[in-house]
Each structure stands twice: as structure tokens, then as C-alpha cells.
């Protein structure tokens, strides 16, 4: 098992669901007998910044969904310093390999007048399924620069929106044009090797071919960090990241 730890102070969308299909015999096949994994955790040190209260008064249904009180989620740190909603992915080391997109859709829900999840990943060509669980109308607007930008209103009980991203792009900010406090971020990658840190700061990337990789982490307020790690045959490695507060 390898172990690496680091720290730092800072650091085409909307295409039809059947586009970008590629012959299966061109895809790289991972050998399960030699594949490894990466696990780790993201932590925040220093003074924990206070979370700002969000004013949802423009929509009473949103206020009611939070019992009258809602707080900013751009930096979620628990009492032990665990940092949630950090996007973790393999940035370098997979060049020359083409991976088949998962046939399992990635779901983003508009629930409680938030996007859930706030941070997510999807492969190029993988279905993004957008649903609205709220009793109010929302508008999902991914502000892509490499992929095609789009926005679409979705009322209560409307059918899911089905979209795909065609090109890699990290990260694409998403907003709701109706509710100004609603934000999310999606990382689009040409491979399945990404994760999002949980509430306890942990993450895991599985089924990774042996090799040397650059692992990158992204947090919407704290920026990016990069670390290099080598995965041996059928081995696991641990890599931790620390963001330092002021």
C-alpha cells in the first residue's frame, strides 16, 4: 500500500441521448486481476469560516423546505475538519486509453430548493438525468464553455430531462435562473476515475489500472491541488489532501 499526503493554502452539453456512440471493440478493458484502488480523505485546517445564512424569502415554498433557515453550502466542514463536496479525479496517466461510458445515468435532483448533489461527476457520453422533486418550478442552467451551454425550466411533476456531455470539461458551474442561491458543479471526464468526498471527507476511486497518475482535487472556494501517485498491480494506495484556512 502506498501513502501520500499533501497540503496547500489555495489553490458538448445537451446532445441527444444516442449521440457519440462508439464501437465497443475500441474501448480499453481493465484487467480486474491487476487493477488497484485509491482511497483518501480531504481535510480543512485553520479557523473554520462561518456559514452565511441564505435568504430564500422570494419563494415561500423554499423557506418552508428548510424550516425558515438555510445556510450556504459552498464550504462544508464538519467539527473534525472533514471537507465534503470536493471533486477528486485522475487528471493525467490514462492518455491513449478510451473508456466506455457507464450505462447507469447520473441523477441531479432539485430538492429543497437546492441541487442535490451539489458536486458530481459524469463521463462523456453518459446520461445525466435531471429531476425536480420540489413543488415549485426550477430552471437548470449549466454554464458550459467547452460543451454547449443550455438552460431548461422544469416544473413540479415534469418528466426528467435527459442530457449528455460530449467533451471533457472540469468544472461546469450550474445555476437556477429562478432561485439565485441554487448552485452545483459537474466534472465531465473521458473516463470513470473520479469521486466526490463525503461528509467525513473520504473518497475512493476503484478499478484503476496499474500506473503512475496525477490526482487532482477541486473545491469551489479553495481551488485545486495536484499529487502524483503510483498504483502497483492489484494494490491499494492512500492519498490525503489538506486545505489550509487563513
Predicted regions and their residues:
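Extracytoplasmic copper-binding redox domains, predominantly the cupredoxin/blue-copper superfamily
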Residues: 7-246
